[in-house]
Curated annotation (Swiss-Prot):
GO terms for cellular component: cytoplasm. Keywords: Cytoplasm, Elongation factor, GTP-binding, Nucleotide-binding, Protein biosynthesis. This is Elongation factor G. CDD domains: EF-G, EFG_III, EFG_mtEFG1_IV, EFG_mtEFG_C, EFG_mtEFG_II. Catalyzes the GTP-dependent ribosomal translocation step during translation elongation. During this step, the ribosome changes from the pre-translocational (PRE) to the post-translocational (POST) state as the newly formed A-site-bound peptidyl-tRNA and P-site-bound deacylated tRNA move to the P and E sites, respectively. Catalyzes the coordinated movement of the two tRNA molecules, the mRNA and conformational changes in the ribosome.
Amino acid sequence: MPREVPLERIRNIGIIAHIDAGKTTTTERILFYTGRTYKLGEVHEGTAVMDWMEQERERGITITAAATTAEWTVEGTPYRINIIDTPGHVDFTAEVERSLRVLDGGVVVFDAVAGVEPQSETVWRQADKYHVPRICFVNKMDRIGANFMRTVDMIRERLGAKPVPVQFPIGAEDRFRGIVDLITNKAVIYVDDQGKREELEAIPADVADEVERLRNEMIEAIAETDDELTLLYLEGEELSVEELRRALRKATIQGKLVPVLCGAALRNKGVQRLLDAVVYYLPSPVDIPPVRGTRPGQIAGDDGVEMITRPTSEDAPFTGLVFKIVSDPFVGKLAYFRVYSGKLETGSYVLNSTRNQRERIGRLLQMHANHREEIKEVYAGDIAAMVGPKQSYTGDTICDPNDPIVLESIRFPEPVIQLAIEPKTKADQDKLAVALGKLAEEDPTFRVFTDPETGQTIIAGMGELHLEVIVDRMRREYKVEANQGKPQVAYRESITVPADVDSKFVRQSGGKGQYGHVKLQVEPLERGKGFEFVNGIVGGVIPREYIPAVEAGVKEAMASGVIAGYPVVDIKVTLYDGSYHEVDSSEMAFKIAASMGLKEAVRKGRPILLEPVMKVEIVTPEDFLGAVLGDINSRRGHVEGMEARGNAQVIRAYVPLASMFGYTTDLRSATQGRATSSMEFAYYQPLPDALAKEIIEKRRG
């Protein structure tokens, strides 16, 4: 069966934004216009198609990235748009990270009243990291206080982007009734509520001057990115609509310009034009560089390791990346994956090259937020889901067994907040482990472990809301009732000076003994670098087959530090010497020797406790500014900057997480409910001695 839609006519896009900018509503409208849903879903009524988990419908926020396929016709040509709806709440950054990794382009939605909000900056930086070309949609133009040009200026100033308005609103707030398309230079007026009927009119006199100025600026910005157009422009030639679109498409894909559109998704205004813009300006899988990877067992960046590329074509060997695991009540485990090259049929085998496991492809599904369609094969550029994978997890590469490749995995931030959880009854005990296991499979930023000292089950995540949603899902989906402790800060340990150790594990008293001997150098890394292991063994003083055991022993010892039993981070461990015994050496012996060695090195390395620091943004009316600033200082925070936004003040500060529990409630009562705040993890920093002492005493009881 040949592919239905040629590659050039596929768009893989994500709709990304700050919470409440109207992202899910925009996606709903897209599904409505592309004929995938016949009744409009409303987030505030709790019927949105994309928000299919119960908690999402209740909270009116999006938690999981649902992937949906839609069709859209532009100028008589049908296109396929695969849409990934992503959450905008900071606690769910992992969802955004993994979506961006497999997208080709993004639609960033802004609220015309609030403009660029803190989470918009985070998402924008994430998109920069993966070089995702994007277009902007300034939504909620019908709300009181909506201001299109202010939002465009904020995109320029706060995000450091080069926004180019390709539309201009006619009217704002309740008088918002249409847009001027600056590319074609025509006014589009919406006649009915559904936004399905449009009429072209002459450009209204009250916006004519502004439109002319913006159109000239737009043409100049587009012409600057293309030498041929620059010449025509300088010679005073009129550039055609096709020339402008072609050059703007190229500049958008290269990340030089960002087209900006506007509308009001809830009123169905501007969404069809947004779909047209997705087709005109965002890349197809063919427009982006081919993916690169290494052969299994090799590490990118090591000496002598050559990178393999996979062109986006069906004739190349099959390569895909799993970007999301979901436990589905009807079909069990689903793995969403993006196909980068080749094609895949049901019934065939693939190699999971990340884990070196074969996986049989039973059924393939194409997803429409919560209704699914069975398909027989998928091709390069597609996004699909496979049913019941045995071995595959988020970030794994799946590929042709005869031509293996490992793509770069997806890196997720470490959890910063944890709480103890215990089942209410004996019956819940067994179900708890199953539920937590499945939830951890789905969400890489959610961790479950047992506290070695108290024996309690600890769950850790990115924020209070994140853990709240997890506990909620346990109750609803897995029917597990559990009591939860107070949220605790996830401290870490590290070292401040390098340390050298010589560690031996020897048991030789008759029969087969044990012998492992390693010399390790352990050095501090800069904050946020995690862990690095270097094998510096030369001349075979330790045989190669024991090296992985040494690394495993080091990692095991890092799980619980020497000061207060918190995980050890930001260290580089070099195995530079050691010895072995022909008969008595084993993997186990080397693992134990390495484990003991690391503990000793951390003791020698002047260990310290690290605490997570949050980046906090507070929007408060002027009258409460003094009180809010005083409060931040009392929480050991430091203010980084302030700016006026409308008649409110925006404070940006860094505050340790330990002093931020319940902050939203305190802030509300201090400001009569008029201030709002948002926070996200920023970095780990050393804990002041007096506080460290307190924590150590508490842990040691």
